[in-house]
Amino acid sequence: MTEDPKRWSQPFAALLGAYAAQIGFGLPSIGGKDSMSGTFQDIDVPPTLVSFAVDMALEQDIITPELKKAGNKLVWLKIERDENDLPVYDAVMDQYGKFMEDIQSGKIVSAYALDRHGVAAAVSKMAFGNRKGAKIEHNVDKRDLFAPAFGDIIAEVEDGKVGELAITYTEIGEVTEEPVLAYGDVKIALADAQDAWTGTLEKVFATKSAADSDAKVEEKLFNTSDIHICSHKIGQPTVFIPVFPGTNCEYDSARAFERAGAKVITKVFRNLDAEDIRGSVDEFEKAIGQAQMIMFPGGFSAGDEPDGSAKFFATAFRNEKLKEAVMDLLNNRDGLALGICNGFQALIKLGLVPEGKIVEQNAKSPTLTTNRIGRHISKVAYTRIASNLSPWFNNVHVDDIFSIPVSHGEGRFVADEDVIQKLFENGQVATQYVDLNGDPTMNEEFNPNGSYHAIEGITSPDGRVLGKMGHSERRDSYVGINIYGQKDQKIFESGVEYFK
């Protein structure tokens, strides 16, 4: 650990500043960690303070930063500062209170908190989201465009409502339809500005692989009237959600099923010792016997070790007790099975998709492998319903397109061409990644993992087992409010209705 007082003075001064802000705003701090003591021999930890701030608000009061509509005005809320350029906290609290009033009344529709990069960076980032342009007026001094302005806010205001604002503001420009950033005679195409911003670290953290392609995928849709009908009706079906070490989507999955009207049984697979494992197998077997559906949730079971995703998941369900219980649910009780993300990986490894039964994998078996970019991806993808074979999609139509979150490191669907063609012919290709025109594509902006034939989800031969990468369970009324498009595939409602 270094004894250099200058190195220690930097985080110390930052902590004093953070403490002053806490006192000024009347806010508490929760915990802290000293990592500078990690400096050892040739390992050097630079003097750094990292702060995370969390607030609570009503869902309907949340706004997002991207520009919404051409013609809307841009205003600059400047906080009051003292002779040392520090916030006058009482005045700032009053300004922020009025700012919240303007949000609640619907006058302010987007906003961005300024930082060390100033107005130009803030307006640019606001423009990138919806590819709306922005014109900044000359009343903004060019020296202020890139000057730090901590605490200030740039807000987008509904056209015609600027004069009704409760906040004290300076009007600085407007939103334009043309995707251009303009200041006086200077005009920069939005695409060029975004490339300059995101391209800085492209060589270090690539956003596209060398194999990225704009190649289109042959369109093959499957419509059938021969959809499996349940012969074991029940008023309120039960779903069993097994939880393994590393699973992290069980709460979202349970909430989605409960909202759809199902009973939920959740059990954790304990593996501290042999007795725990035997007990967990018995509990899982009993839960499957009580359920009409089983859902394998997303996450990183066993940390995706050893050497691959969902191996722990699949190994557990190859236990004879669990194997027989699952096949009894499917074969004798007309049950359903669903796997999302890590759960899809488990279904693939078990053979439940595409075979519809637990079997050993062979050289012709499809698999889900590392994303083409070689790392984890997390974004919203557009997926299209390619087949109506599955009861899980009874409430949607072939060719419907949805905006679905994806988050995985191994989601690239790979199989031999003859296997894929057979899946299409049987209607087992359930969903595909598509571009803005609704066409399946190999472009990584839309097919983020590089799946063959843009395949996002497949089913068993009769459609009762569905595996997909996209997290349909994460949909909620106020989740992703700035993401456009249909988000609810009604998978969970369809699963429940299948038994009624």
Which stretches of residues belong to each language-model region?
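Thiamine diphosphate
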Residues: 1-21, 33, 97, 322-327
